[in-house]
Regions:
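Active-site mouth loops of central-metabolism enzymes
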Residues: 25-39, 69-76, 110, 126-132
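Hydrophobic faces of well-ordered beta-strands that scaffold small-molecule active sites
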Residues: 20-23, 55-57, 97-101
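Non-globular sequence segments
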Residues: 96, 102-132
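Catalytic domains of carbohydrate-active enzymes, especially glycoside hydrolases
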Residues: 41-63
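Alpha-helix-loop-beta-strand connector modules within alpha/beta enzyme cores
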Residues: 72-98
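N-terminal amphipathic alpha-helix/helix-capping segment at the start of soluble metabolic enzymes
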Residues: 1-24, 90
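Glycine-rich, proline-tolerant flexible connector loops at the mouths of alpha/beta enzymes
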Residues: 56-80, 101-114
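Conserved, mostly hydrophobic/aromatic
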Residues: 22, 47, 51, 90, ...
Length: 135
């Protein structure tokens, strides 16, 4: 059933060592400043060593003020060296890296520090507590 899972695959010139993919997540290992940290690098390197052929690196904000705290950013050139260091570490272990770009918007939820950007004004209700009858 899984004969091809651990076999290499070529996608438009990029060869993956297998078909195992780590989806993008928000580990919040980048801390409040949204930069790549050693903890984040270690996390992704461990996933490659564990067998992932492709790591989708985090939820990465294209507009830092609208991102939840602790999420990576790629909104300014100053973030690029850290992202390159992370990518190089993944490549050094034989993995490949991709990235999930995010603008934040309503996904920032209740993060009071985020400056939510949206395409247009949208009225929204503040949430309310749930009760046993609703659940």
């Amino acid at each position: 059933m899984f004969e091809k899972l651990f076999s290499p695959i070529k996608i438009r010139g990029m060869e993956l060592k297998n078909r195992v993919m780590l989806p993008a997540m928000g580990t919040k290992f980048s801390g409040k400043a949204s930069y790549v940290t050693d903890q984040l690098i270690d996390y992704h390197v461990a996933r490659v060593k564990g067998g992932c052929g492709l790591n989708m690196v985090e939820v990465c904000s294209v507009h830092t003020p609208s991102a939840p705290r602790g999420f990576l950013s790629i909104s300014e050139d100053e973030y690029v060296p850290g992202l390159k260091k992370l990518t190089d570490a993944i490549h050094a272990e034989g993995g490949k890296a991709g990235i999930q770009l995010s603008q934040g918007s309503m996904a920032v939820g209740m993060d009071q520090t985020a400056q939510i950007l949206m395409a247009s004004d949208m009225p929204m209700e503040i949430g309310r507590a749930s009760c046993r009858e609703r659940v």
